[in-house]
Amino acid sequence: MERPLHLLLVFLSSPWLLLLQGVSSLQFTRDDFPHDFAFGAGTSAYQYEGGAAEDGRTPSIWDTYTHSGRHPEDETGDVASDGYHKYKEDVKLMSEIGLEAYRFTISWSRLIPSGRGAVNLKALQFYNSMINELVKAGIQIHVVMYHMDLPQSLQDEYGGWISPKIVDDFTAYADVCFREFGDRVVHWTTVLEPNAMAQAGYDMGILPPNRCSYPFGSNCTAGNSSVEPYLFIHHSLLAHASAVRLYREKYKVAQKGIIGINIYSMWFYPFTDSAEEIGATERAKKFIYGWILHPLVFGDYPDTMKKAAGSRLPIFSNHESEMVTNSFDFIGLNHYSSVYTSNNNNVVKAPLQDLTADVATLFRVTKNDTPTPVFVPGTIVDPRGLEHALKYIREKYGNLPIYIQENGSGSSSETLDDVERINYLAKYIAATLKAIRSGANVKGYSMWSFVDLYELFGGYSTWHFGLVAVDFDSEKRRRQPRRSASWYSEFLKNNSVIRVEEDGFVSAASHAQL
């Protein structure tokens, strides 16, 4: 049910008192979180850096995708937020806001332009300089090694992630990252959102590397929607586990870091209380959460997936199962919203079937929406969904250490007076605290995003997620902090009081981000 957003800022000298409606009534400050909990914000290399053809960087699959005209807005990330040139200014802004942590990704095709072999010295200078700036600012560093930007050379050579050859190349790339940056980087994430990339990139072909097959996807020049999503995840897990083993054997004693993997998360509510709808909801959870977490905890894929995909689902050898099991120190969670789910009665078992048919579930953002068989990012503000997701993980897979690595609200408006974003963030931060008090082992929270970015589906003009606005019409990509940056700063630096009142679902601007 749609309800208006309500926000009242009451200034009682200092700190601020923020009254919001959202999760059940809760009043809190920064000090209510554990002493080692870190609040931050994030960016991603292709969306942030720019400098696409500078200093030895070579094309990634994202460059190929956007330059082929497949992006809906026909825009590229060639300049993006120009972080390649403006990172020092950005770190200064982070410090002024009071960020305790910053999560960014490394561009593989910048660091190792050929995908393997020689390291780009200019890239080393860039990442070392940025890391050093963060260290000087006292900001905790969280590095992601891969987010959908494979060097195009490896995609051309052997098909990238659908080939087992990727395991050795990714491990060698990770080795360079650990060796060059690990003396200052403590928090490592191997792969970001593989469960989302599987459908978007390899079943539907709507994101890089734009692989799909008829009749399941369209506008693809190559691919196999029946098997490639499963190969991609399988090799992602093996590459992740190989990198973790390398880190633990070669670097962990000296560097004392931790390493994990990230999953895209949404919460699912059955459309009705029927057994059929509840079954579809549980099946969707297995494909979103269990596809990654089940092998990491139990060494194999969920039985639900084995039954649905059959022989198309790869099998772990005993050695691979042992390597994958417990190959993490934490799980990164990207969470934005919730959706309604129902059984897809139109799916009939056929010799040729894709991931979407295997899930056999329909999704609705609201109960009045037309259902779609594709995992659809939600647009409702539902902080309880985050609580449910954390509880589900704890009950099914144990009380795993979790970093919320992305959570945020996007708006089509470029306004600096982003009250809706403040509303959203306050509710989800409150939900995080409630989950911690209920026993969830959440170690950190990173909002999405630090600055406005080149958005994966929306380009420059459709959605703006940043605490800091970026003028994409300006050659200098001028920065200007939004009201949400001031609010976040008051919470982090001045221990301002936030009170969130119970309300339930609240409709807001889209905050879905893959």
Curated annotation (Swiss-Prot):
Record-level Gene Ontology MF annotations: beta-D-fucosidase activity; beta-galactosidase activity; beta-glucosidase activity
UniProt cross-references to Gene3D superfamilies, sorted A to Z: Glycosidases (3.20.20.80)
Gene Ontology biological process terms from the UniProt entry: carbohydrate metabolic process
Residues carrying covalently attached carbohydrate according to the record: N219, N224, N407, N494
InterPro entries (UniProt xref): Glyco_hydro_1 (IPR001360), Glyco_hydro_1_N_CS (IPR033132), Glycoside_hydrolase_SF (IPR017853)
This protein's UniProt keywords: Disulfide bond, Glycoprotein, Glycosidase, Hydrolase, Signal
Residues binding a beta-D-glucoside, per UniProt: Q47, H147, Y336, E406, W448, F465
Intrachain disulfide bonds: C212-C220
Reactions accelerated catalytically: Hydrolysis of terminal, non-reducing beta-D-glucosyl residues with release of beta-D-glucose
PANTHER family: BETA-GLUCOSIDASE 20, GLYCOSYL HYDROLASE
UniProt protein name: Beta-glucosidase 21
Lineage of source species: Eukaryota, Viridiplantae, Streptophyta, Embryophyta, Tracheophyta
Gene expressing this chain: BGLU21
